[in-house]
UniProtKB/Swiss-Prot annotation:
Species lineage: Eukaryota, Viridiplantae, Streptophyta, Embryophyta, Tracheophyta
One GO biological process term: positive regulation of transcription by RNA polymerase II
SUPFAM superfamilies tied to this protein: SRF-like
Gene3D superfamilies, sorted: Transcription factor, MADS-box
Protein name according to UniProt: Floral homeotic protein AGAMOUS
Record organism: Brassica napus
């Protein structure tokens, strides 16, 4: 986009033209000024056209004369080019401002986070008993109170977990007892349905048929014993010196 008000002047301070130097200043003579304006305007329009063709550029040229007359050139549309220009200026301005605002915000947030990290580190050192040499008695009492509250919370949580474990074990014990009772009931029902199974070792009536062995020795009963000598022939004698071996045979 190019905006130019042609006043009959050049952009450089001095320019060599023709046979001498022409001073760049406002032309006082009205006729000469108008002639110069027409020549320079046509040259400017020609340059704009050449730029758009040679470089495939979007060019829009607007020129107002000293009398307020409008002269324009555009290879596309003057209005469309102006709208594009406004949008580009707006986007650049917004992008710059948003980026600057974001940068400031992140810098502030970063500073806050660094301060929080330092504060937490100092608090942890104090809880561990470090860096307490410069603390006042009031600060030490506050620290002691914090530690007591922390210990109480830890102890409460520990007791809660222990009680939960005990409750679980008690419920587990009840479940196992119920399972055991159910198993006994199934065994008893099995034995009622199959009486022959009750006579086998391991059945419920096995202990009634075969009483448990007695731990106390039974009293001696002479009726259960016979002398072995009474079963031997009369002519059999032992040559022991006045003694006979007598062996008792118990009948069960």
């Amino acid at each position: 986009m190019a905006y130019q008000m042609e006043l009959g002047g050049e952009s450089s301070p001095q320019r060599k033209a023709g046979r001498g130097k022409i001073e760049i200043k406002r032309i006082e003579n009205t006729t000469n000024r108008q002639v110069t304006f027409c020549k320079r305007r046509n040259g400017l329009l020609k340059k704009a056209y050449e730029l758009s063709v040679l470089c495939d550029a979007e060019v829009a040229l607007i020129v107002f004369s000293s009398r307020g007359r409008l002269y324009e050139y555009s290879n596309n549309s003057v209005k469309g080019t102006i709208e594009r220009y406004k949008k580009a200026i707006s986007d650049n301005s917004n992008t710059g401002s948003v980026a600057e605002i974001n940068a400031q915000y992140y810098q502030q947030e970063s500073a806050k986070l660094r301060q929080q990290i330092i504060s937490i580190q100092n608090s942890n050192r104090q809880l561990m008993g470090e860096t307490i040499g410069s603390m006042s008695p009031k600060e030490l009492r506050n620290l002691e109170g914090r530690l007591d509250r922390s210990v109480n919370r830890i102890r409460s949580k520990k007791n809660e977990l222990l009680f939960a474990e005990i409750d679980y074990m008690q419920k587990r014990e009840v479940d196992l007892h119920n399972d055991n009772q159910l198993l006994r009931a199934k065994i008893a029902e099995n034995e009622r349905n199959n009486p022959s199974m009750s006579l086998m070792p391991g059945g419920s009536n096995y202990e009634q048929i075969m009483p448990p062995p007695q731990t106390q020795p039974q009293p001696f009963d002479s009726r259960n014993y016979f002398q072995v000598a009474a079963l031997q022939p009369n002519n059999h004698h032992y040559s022991s010196a006045g003694r006979e071996d007598q062996t008792a045979l118990q009948l069960v």
